[in-house]
A protein has these predicted regions:
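Juxtamembrane helix-loop transition segments at the membrane interface in multi-pass membrane proteins
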Residues: 149-154, 213-228, 395-414, 734-742
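Conserved ATP-binding TGD loop and adjacent catalytic N/P-domain core of P-type ATPases
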Residues: 2, 38, 503-505, 537-539, ...
Length: 742
C-alpha cells in the first residue's frame, strides 16, 4: 500500500472534506482522510490498482481538484490569489449592498428617497431598483451558488448549499413579490427580501475573507521554517568562488559562509570556526560553537566567523526539509478527538436542510403567513455553520504542532499531540538520555600477572570498531596514552552482555557479570572492586582472557546538566519517573539518586525493554518512553507515547511519536504542557462550535419566539452570526501561538 499526501482544492467547509473522503473510501483498497484546515488529503491505496491520475479523477467526480506536488511558493501564490479574489468580490458586494439597504430600509428610518423610488408613489420602481442592485451581489457570491447547487445535485450538500438555498429562496420570493406588485397587490413592496439576499452574501463573503486570513496565520510555523532556507549558496569550483542556486548544490561541494549569512544545507566544517544560531530550528536561544569536523545544519545562521563546509545532505535529505515534512504530516493528520465532530459534520448539512423545511412548513401551516415562514426558513439555513465544527480540531493541531516545532519539539501526529497530556508514568533510558552518552574511562584494575597498559591495549584493540559509547571511552583512553591498537579477529557483539573476539591467538571477552556467569568464569577476586566502582555510579566491565579473569575496566557517563531540573518539573506535574537500563543495580541506583528519579529497573537486556513497558501498561499506566532511538526503538514503539531525544541532526526517528531536537530533557515537560494546552483549546473550540449550532438553530427556527415570546432572528443577523462563528474558532486556536513552552 502506498501512502501519499496531496492538496485538495475547492473545499469550503467540513462537509466538503467529508464528500472527498466519502468518494474515495467507497472504493476498495483506498483509505482516505481529509483535513479541512490544511486542505491536505492523506491517502493509502494499492499501487497495483491506483495511481495519482485515478485518485484525482475520483476527487474530481466529487466536485473538487487535486494537486500532486504543490510547492510552498505555489501555495502562497494560490493563497494570495484567494485573498485578492475575496477582497474584490467583497468590495463589489459592499458597493451595491449599501444603496440596496438605503433604498429598502432607509425610508423606515426617515431617510429621503427620490419620488420615482418612493414605495408609496412608485412601488414597482422601488422593487426593480432593489432587484437590479442585487444582481451584482449575486455575481460577487457566484461560487456559493455554483458549488452549492452542484453539491446538492451530487447528494453531498455543503455549507455553500445552505447559503445558496437561503439566498435563492430570498431572491425568488423577491421576484414573486415584484410580480404581485405588477399584478394584484401594490403593498407587496413591504416584503421584498432582496436586501436579505444581498446582506447574507456580503456578510458571508466578509466572513470568508476573515477566515482565509486567519487560517493563513495558523500555518505560519511552516512558512517560517521554509523561509529559513536561502535561495543561493557560494561554493568553491576549480579554486574559484561562485554563487549558485541552492537546488544546484551537490553532495561534496565546498560551501563558503560568511558572518551573518544562512547556512544553505547540512554539512561538515572543513575550514574555520564560528558560532551558529540554531534557534529557529531547535529553539536553542544561545549560539552553538562550531569548529573543523563539526556538523552544521541548513537554515541556521552563521554568527561571527567565516567557514567552509562540505555539503553532506541536500534537498529533501536535510534536517530542515525533514522537519518541514514531519510538521506538515502532523498538521495534516487527524486527532481521535475530531471523530465526533467529523461524524456530526457528515450529516450536518442534510439535517439542517430538513430542519429548515420543517420550520418553514410549520410556521406556514400555523397561519403565520408565507413571509414569516420564509424568514424562519432562511434564518435556519444561514445560521448553521458546519465550518466551525470542521475547523475546531485541525486548526488547534496546526498551531500546536507549529508551536512545538518552533521550540524544538517535533510532534509527529495529531494523535500524539492529543494523548501526550495523559502521561502518568515516564520511563527513561539512561545512556544518551539522562547522561550525555559520552562515557570516559575512569578505572582499570589488573589481576594476576597482567599490567594495566597491557589490558588497555587488548581492550582497545578488540573494541576499536565497536560503535558502543562504552567501547569508545576505552579506545579514546588508549589513543590518549599513545598505546598501539592492533588488529583482532572473530569479533562478536552480544547485546546486553558484552563482546567477544580473538586477539593475538587468545580469546578475549569484555562484558558484565551475566557474561562471566554464562562462561562460568570466577570473578570472586574482583568482587570488592566491582562493588566500590558500582557504588560510585560507574559502569564496571570484566575483562577475561582465555576464560580467566584478567581485570576490570570502569567507565562513567556524565549526567546532563538539565536532567535533574527536567525530572523535578515532571514530578511537580504528578508524573512518576522510572529509569530503565542495562547497567548493574548499584550503578543505576547511583545515577537515579543523582537526578531524583523515583524507581529503577536495572540489568535489562535491550530486547527486554519493550516487555518492561508492556508490564507497566498492564497495570493500567499510561506510559511514555524517552530514549535516543538507537537500541530502544521497540520500547519507544510499545509505549503509549514514544519520545526520542534527538541530537540536532537526527529527526527522522521512525519509532518515536515525538522528537526533541535539542537533546534537552526539559522539553519532555514542555511537550506535555503543550499537549495539555492544545487539548484544552480543542475542547473550547468544540464546545463553542456545538453550543453555537445547538443554540443558534432553534433560535433561528423561532422556538424562543413561539414559546417564550422571545426575539425573532432576522436572516441578516443569522448570516452575521454564521460569518463570525468560524472566525471565532480560528481566533481561539491562534491563542496557542502565545503559549510559552517552558
Amino acid at each position: 500500500m502506498a501512502e501519499k499526501i496531496y492538496t485538495v482544492t475547492g473545499m469550503s467547509c467540513a462537509a466538503c472534506a467529508n464528500a472527498v473522503e466519502k468518494a474515495l473510501n467507497k472504493n476498495e483498497d483506498i483509505n482516505a482522510s481529509v483535513n479541512i484546515a490544511t486542505e491536505k488529503l492523506n491517502v493509502e491505496y494499492d499501487e497495483g490498482k491506483y495511481d495519482f491520475d485515478k485518485i484525482r479523477k475520483i476527487v474530481e467526480s466529487a466536485g473538487y481538484g487535486l494537486v500532486e506536488n504543490m510547492t510552498e511558493d505555489r501555495k502562497v501564490e494560490l493563497y494570495q490569489e484567494k485573498i485578492t479574489s475575496l477582497k474584490k468580490r467583497l468590495i463589489l458586494a459592499i458597493v451595491f449592498v449599501i444603496p440596496l439597504l438605503y433604498i429598502s430600509m432607509g425610508h423606515m428610518l426617515g431617510a429621503a428617497l427620490p419620488e420615482f423610488l418612493n414605495p408609496k408613489v412608485n412601488a414597482l420602481n422601488f422593487a426593480l431598483a432593489q432587484f437590479v442592485l442585487t444582481l451584482p451581489i449575486i455575481y460577487a457570491g457566484r461560487d456559493f451558488f455554483s458549488h452549492g447547487f452542484k453539491n446538492l445535485v451530487r447528494k453531498s450538500p455543503t455549507m455553500d448549499s445552505l447559503i445558496a438555498i437561503g439566498a435563492t429562496a430570498a431572491i425568488l420570493y423577491g421576484i414573486y413579490a415584484t410580480y404581485r406588485i405588477v399584478t394584484v397587490d401594490p403593498e407587496a413592496h413591504m416584503d421584498l427580501y432582496y436586501e436579505s439576499a444581498g446582506v447574507i452574501i456580503t456578510l458571508i463573503l466578509f466572513g470568508k475573507l476573515l477566515e482565509a486570513k486567519t487560517k493563513g496565520q495558523t500555518s505560519s510555523a511552516i512558512k517560517k521554517l521554509i523561509g529559513l532556507q536561502p535561495k543561493k549558496a557560494k561554493i568553491i569550483e576549480n579554486g574559484v568562488e561562485k554563487e549558485i542556486l541552492i537546488e544546484n548544490l551537490k553532495v561534496g561541494d565546498i560551501v563558503i559562509v560568511k558572518p551573518g549569512e544562512k547556512i544553505a544545507v547540512d554539512g561538515k566544517i572543513v575550514e574555520g570556526s564560528t558560532s551558529v544560531d540554531e534557534s529557529m530550528l531547535t529553539g536553542e536561544s544561545l549560539p552553538v560553537s562550531k569548529k573543523v569536523g563539526d556538523k552544521v545544519v541548513g537554515g541556521s545562521i552563521n554568527k561571527n566567523g567565516s567557514i567552509r563546509f562540505e555539503a553532506t545532505e541536500i534537498g529533501k535529505n536535510t534536517v530542515l526539509s525533514q522537519i518541514i515534512k514531519l510538521v506538515e504530516e502532523a498538521q495534516g493528520s487527524k486527532a481521535p478527538i475530531s471523530r465526533m465532530a467529523d461524524v456530526v459534520a457528515a450529516y450536518f448539512v442534510p439535517i439542517v436542510i430538513g430542519i429548515a423545511i420543517i420550520t418553514g412548513v410549520a410556521w406556514f401551516v400555523s397561519g403565520s403567513g408565507l413571509v414569516t415562514a420564509l424568514s424562519f426558513f432562511i434564518a435556519v439555513l444561514v445560521i448553521a455553520c458546519p465550518c466551525a465544527l470542521g475547523l475546531a480540531t485541525p486548526t488547534s493541531i496546526m498551531v500546536g504542532t507549529g508551536k512545538g516545532a518552533e521550540n524544538g519539539i517535533l510532534i509527529k501526529s495529531g494523535e500524539a499531540l492529543e494523548t501526550t497530556y495523559k502521561i502518568k508514568t515516564i520511563v527513561f533510558d539512561k545512556t544518551g538520555t539522562i547522561t550525555k552518552g559520552k562515557p570516559v574511562l575512569t578505572d582499570l584494575i589488573a589481576y594476576g600477572n597482567y599490567k594495566e597498559d597491557e589490558l588497555l591495549k587488548i581492550a582497545a584493540s578488540v573494541e576499536n570498531d565497536s560503535e558502543h559509547p562504552l567501547a569508545e571511552a576505552i579506545v579514546n583512553e588508549a589513543k590518549g596514552k599513545n598505546i598501539e591498537i592492533k588488529p583482532y579477529e572473530k569479533f562478536r557483539a552480544m547485546p546486553g552482555y558484552g563482546i567477544r573476539a580473538t586477539f593475538e591467538g587468545k580469546e578475549i571477552q569484555i562484558g558484565n557479570k551475566k557474561l562471566m556467569e554464562n562462561k562460568k568464569i570466577n570473578v570472586e577476586i574482583s568482587q570488592k572492586d566491582y562493588n566500590i566502582l558500582s557504588n560510585e555510579g560507574k559502569t564496571p566491565m570484566y575483562i577475561s582472557i582465555d576464560n580467566e579473569l584478567a581485570g576490570i575496566v570502569a567507565v562513567a557517563d556524565v549526567i546532563k546538566e538539565t536532567s535533574r531540573e527536567a525530572i523535578e518539573k515532571l514530578k511537580k506535574m504528578g508524573i512518576k519517573t522510572i529509569m530503565l537500563t542495562g547497567d548493574n543495580e548499584k550503578t543505576a541506583e547511583f545515577i537515579a539518586k543523582q537526578v531524583g528519579i523515583d524507581d529503577v529497573i536495572s540489568e535489562v537486556l535491550p530486547y527486554q525493554k519493550s516487555q518492561k513497558i508492556k508490564e507497566l501498561q498492564e497495570k493500567d499506566e499510561f506510559v511514555a518512553m524517552v530514549g535516543d532511538g538507537i537500541n530502544d526503538s521497540p520500547a519507544l514503539a510499545q509505549a503509549n507515547v514514544g519520545i526520542a531525544i534527538g541530537n540536532g541532526t537526527d529527526v527522522a526517528i521512525e519509532s518515536a511519536d515525538i522528537v526533541l531536537i535539542r537533546n534537552d530533557l526539559r522539553d519532555v515537560a514542555g511537550a506535555i504542557a503543550l499537549s495539555k494546552a492544545t487539548i484544552t483549546n480543542i475542547k473550547e473550540n468544540l464546545f463553542w462550535a456545538f453550543f453555537y449550532n445547538v443554540l443558534g438553530i432553534p433560535f433561528a427556527a423561532g422556538i424562543f419566539y413561539a414559546f417564550f415570546n422571545g426575539p425573532k432572528l432576522d436572516p441578516m443577523i443569522a448570516a452575521f452570526a454564521m460569518s463570525f462563528s468560524s472566525v471565532s474558532v480560528l481566533g481561539n486556536a491562534l491563542r496557542l501561538k502565545f503559549f510559552k513552552v517552558k
